[in-house]
Amino acid sequence: MKPSFSINSNYLFKRFFGKNFEAGIELCLQIIKDSLQLSFQPEFALMIVSPWKMKRLNRQFLNRKGVTDVISICYNENEAGFSPAIGEIFLCPKHIFKQAKQFGCTPWFLLTRNLIHGLLHLFEFDHEQSLAFESVTMFFQDEIHETVLKLWNR
Protein backbone atom coordinates (compact mmCIF):
# COMPACT_ATOMS: atom_id res chain seq x y z
CA MET A 1 0.00 0.00 0.00
CA LYS A 2 1.45 3.33 -1.09
CA PRO A 3 1.59 6.40 1.14
CA SER A 4 -1.16 8.81 0.20
CA PHE A 5 -1.27 12.51 -0.32
CA SER A 6 -3.44 15.06 -1.99
CA ILE A 7 -2.34 18.09 -3.96
CA ASN A 8 -4.49 21.19 -4.12
CA SER A 9 -3.42 22.10 -7.67
CA ASN A 10 -2.11 19.37 -9.94
CA TYR A 11 -2.08 21.83 -12.84
CA LEU A 12 0.19 24.31 -11.06
CA PHE A 13 2.46 21.58 -9.79
CA LYS A 14 2.83 20.03 -13.25
CA ARG A 15 3.48 23.47 -14.70
CA PHE A 16 6.35 24.09 -12.30
CA PHE A 17 7.86 20.63 -11.84
CA GLY A 18 6.82 18.36 -14.69
CA LYS A 19 4.43 15.48 -15.17
CA ASN A 20 6.18 12.82 -13.04
CA PHE A 21 6.15 14.76 -9.79
CA GLU A 22 3.73 12.39 -8.05
CA ALA A 23 6.17 9.50 -8.26
CA GLY A 24 8.87 11.71 -6.74
CA ILE A 25 6.58 12.72 -3.89
CA GLU A 26 5.65 9.07 -3.25
CA LEU A 27 9.34 8.18 -3.20
CA CYS A 28 10.16 10.91 -0.64
CA LEU A 29 7.33 9.79 1.61
CA GLN A 30 8.14 6.09 1.27
CA ILE A 31 11.81 6.60 2.15
CA ILE A 32 10.87 8.61 5.25
CA LYS A 33 8.27 5.99 6.20
CA ASP A 34 10.84 3.20 5.85
CA SER A 35 13.55 5.17 7.67
CA LEU A 36 11.25 5.85 10.62
CA GLN A 37 9.89 2.28 10.47
CA LEU A 38 6.30 3.48 10.52
CA SER A 39 3.62 0.80 10.62
CA PHE A 40 0.90 3.00 9.09
CA GLN A 41 0.48 4.71 5.75
CA PRO A 42 1.05 8.44 6.30
CA GLU A 43 -1.28 10.91 4.62
CA PHE A 44 -0.74 14.59 4.04
CA ALA A 45 -2.05 17.42 1.93
CA LEU A 46 0.39 19.29 -0.29
CA MET A 47 -0.75 22.84 -0.88
CA ILE A 48 0.78 24.86 -3.71
CA VAL A 49 0.55 28.55 -2.89
CA SER A 50 1.53 31.92 -4.29
CA PRO A 51 4.23 34.09 -2.70
CA TRP A 52 1.47 36.36 -1.34
CA LYS A 53 -0.32 33.43 0.33
CA MET A 54 2.95 32.01 1.69
CA LYS A 55 3.80 35.38 3.20
CA ARG A 56 0.42 35.39 5.00
CA LEU A 57 0.88 31.80 6.24
CA ASN A 58 4.38 32.61 7.47
CA ARG A 59 3.02 35.50 9.52
CA GLN A 60 -0.03 33.55 10.76
CA PHE A 61 1.66 30.31 11.81
CA LEU A 62 5.29 31.23 12.47
CA ASN A 63 4.98 34.93 13.29
CA ARG A 64 7.65 35.70 10.69
CA LYS A 65 7.80 38.25 7.93
CA GLY A 66 8.32 37.52 4.26
CA VAL A 67 7.96 34.63 1.86
CA THR A 68 9.41 31.23 2.64
CA ASP A 69 9.72 28.05 0.61
CA VAL A 70 7.94 25.53 2.87
CA ILE A 71 5.63 25.57 5.89
CA SER A 72 4.30 22.46 7.64
CA ILE A 73 1.20 22.33 9.80
CA CYS A 74 1.15 19.24 12.02
CA TYR A 75 -2.33 17.96 12.95
CA ASN A 76 -1.17 15.93 15.92
CA GLU A 77 1.64 18.03 17.38
CA ASN A 78 0.72 17.43 21.02
CA GLU A 79 -0.54 13.85 20.79
CA ALA A 80 1.40 10.73 21.70
CA GLY A 81 2.17 8.82 18.53
CA PHE A 82 1.18 9.55 14.96
CA SER A 83 -2.13 9.16 13.23
CA PRO A 84 -2.36 8.41 9.50
CA ALA A 85 -3.43 11.99 8.70
CA ILE A 86 -0.34 13.88 9.77
CA GLY A 87 -0.80 17.37 8.37
CA GLU A 88 -0.37 19.83 5.54
CA ILE A 89 2.68 21.06 3.70
CA PHE A 90 2.59 24.39 1.91
CA LEU A 91 5.10 24.94 -0.91
CA CYS A 92 5.71 28.10 -2.90
CA PRO A 93 7.04 27.09 -6.36
CA LYS A 94 7.86 30.65 -7.41
CA HIS A 95 10.03 31.09 -4.33
CA ILE A 96 11.66 27.69 -4.90
CA PHE A 97 12.50 28.66 -8.50
CA LYS A 98 13.94 31.96 -7.29
CA GLN A 99 16.09 30.16 -4.71
CA ALA A 100 17.23 27.57 -7.26
CA LYS A 101 18.61 30.36 -9.46
CA GLN A 102 20.20 32.02 -6.44
CA PHE A 103 21.86 28.80 -5.21
CA GLY A 104 22.76 27.45 -8.67
CA CYS A 105 20.77 24.22 -8.42
CA THR A 106 17.71 22.80 -10.13
CA PRO A 107 14.18 23.54 -8.94
CA TRP A 108 13.64 19.77 -8.58
CA PHE A 109 16.62 19.54 -6.18
CA LEU A 110 15.11 22.25 -3.95
CA LEU A 111 11.57 20.92 -4.29
CA THR A 112 12.56 17.48 -3.02
CA ARG A 113 14.70 18.98 -0.26
CA ASN A 114 11.85 21.25 0.87
CA LEU A 115 9.32 18.43 0.67
CA ILE A 116 11.53 16.21 2.84
CA HIS A 117 12.08 19.11 5.24
CA GLY A 118 8.32 19.67 5.47
CA LEU A 119 7.60 15.97 5.99
CA LEU A 120 10.18 15.74 8.77
CA HIS A 121 8.45 18.62 10.54
CA LEU A 122 5.18 16.66 10.32
CA PHE A 123 6.97 13.78 12.02
CA GLU A 124 7.99 16.17 14.80
CA PHE A 125 11.58 16.72 13.73
CA ASP A 126 11.99 20.32 14.83
CA HIS A 127 15.41 21.73 14.02
CA GLU A 128 14.56 24.88 15.98
CA GLN A 129 14.34 23.04 19.34
CA SER A 130 18.07 22.98 19.99
CA LEU A 131 21.41 23.00 18.20
CA ALA A 132 21.82 19.27 18.86
CA PHE A 133 18.38 18.47 17.44
CA GLU A 134 19.11 20.70 14.45
CA SER A 135 22.23 18.64 13.69
CA VAL A 136 20.30 15.37 13.88
CA THR A 137 17.41 16.71 11.80
CA MET A 138 19.64 18.16 9.08
CA PHE A 139 21.75 14.99 8.93
CA PHE A 140 18.62 12.87 8.56
CA GLN A 141 17.23 15.29 5.95
CA ASP A 142 20.46 15.17 3.92
CA GLU A 143 20.60 11.35 4.07
CA ILE A 144 17.01 11.02 2.86
CA HIS A 145 17.52 13.65 0.16
CA GLU A 146 20.62 11.90 -1.13
CA THR A 147 18.71 8.60 -1.31
CA VAL A 148 15.79 10.22 -3.13
CA LEU A 149 18.11 11.85 -5.68
CA LYS A 150 19.89 8.54 -6.32
CA LEU A 151 16.64 6.63 -6.79
CA TRP A 152 14.74 9.31 -8.64
CA ASN A 153 16.27 9.73 -12.05
CA ARG A 154 15.58 13.39 -12.74
Curated annotation (Swiss-Prot):
GO cellular component: cytoplasm
Enzyme class: hydrolase
SUPFAM superfamilies given in the database record: Metalloproteases ('zincins'), catalytic domain
Residues binding Zn(2+): H117, H121, H127
EC number: 3.1.-.-
Entries under Gene3D superfamilies matching the protein: Metalloproteases ('zincins'), catalytic domain
Pfam families: YbeY
Cofactor note: Binds 1 zinc ion.
GO molecular function, one term: RNA endonuclease activity
Compartments where located: Cytoplasm
One GO-annotated biological process of the protein: rRNA processing
Keyword NADP: no
Keywords, in A-Z order: Cytoplasm, Endonuclease, Hydrolase, Metal-binding, Nuclease, Ribosome biogenesis, rRNA processing, Zinc
Primary location: cytoplasm
The UniProt record lists the keyword Iron-sulfur: no
Cofactor (UniProt): Zn(2+)
InterPro entries to which the protein is assigned, alphabetical: MetalPrtase_cat_dom_sf_prd, YbeY
Similarity field: Belongs to the endoribonuclease YbeY family.
Biological role: Single strand-specific metallo-endoribonuclease involved in late-stage 70S ribosome quality control and in maturation of the 3' terminus of the 16S rRNA.
Protein name: Endoribonuclease YbeY
Organism for this UniProt entry: Mycoplasma pneumoniae (strain ATCC 29342 / M129 / Subtype 1)
Gene: ybeY
